[in-house]
């Protein structure tokens, strides 16, 4: 499994990339492999408030539907509209073109509650 060292992670298999005051969020390689072929993504609307560990998006595969959780409190500033027409980007490029949404975070200190790459690797074995 690919677990980039420069990202943060949640126990619910989201990855987080810090981009100034914003963060970009997607699901991990482990999560997309468990879901198998992604066929639909329900994206959050720009401007939607997000609460930590509360579902904000849904990824559906041929196998299951899975909630995607906001890793920290913030406001949605961008959603990856490319997933509407090509949800398989989550499978083919989960850490790049397969990102799901971006948040403007309310408090950068909240990021301290997220996992390092090593902690996430330990979690998934």
Model regions and ranges:
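Histidine- and aromatic-rich ligand-binding microenvironments
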Residues: 67-71, 104
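Short, conserved catalytic or interaction motifs in soluble domains
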Residues: 61-64, 81
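A short beta-strand motif that forms part of the nucleic acid-binding face
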Residues: 29, 63, 72
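Composition-driven detection of intrinsically disordered, low-complexity segments
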Residues: 42, 65-68
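Structural motif
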Residues: 22, 73-75
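Short, charge-rich, low-complexity interaction segments located
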Residues: 76-92
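Acidic, low-complexity mobile loops and tails
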Residues: 1-58, 88, 92-125
């Amino acid at each position: 499994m690919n677990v980039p060292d420069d990202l943060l992670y949640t126990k619910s298999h989201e990855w987080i990339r810090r981009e100034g005051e914003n963060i970009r969020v997607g699901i991990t390689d482990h999560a997309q492999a468990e879901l198998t072929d992604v066929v639909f993504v329900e994206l959050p609307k720009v401007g939607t408030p997000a609460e930590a560990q509360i579902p904000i998006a849904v990824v559906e595969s041929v196998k299951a539907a899975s909630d995607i959780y906001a890793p920290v409190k913030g406001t949605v500033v961008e959603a990856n509209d490319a997933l509407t027409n090509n949800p398989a980007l989550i499978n083919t490029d989960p850490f790049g073109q397969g990102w799901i949404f971006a948040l403007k975070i309310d408090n950068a200190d909240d990021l301290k509650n997220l996992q390092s790459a090593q902690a996430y690797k330990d979690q998934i074995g």
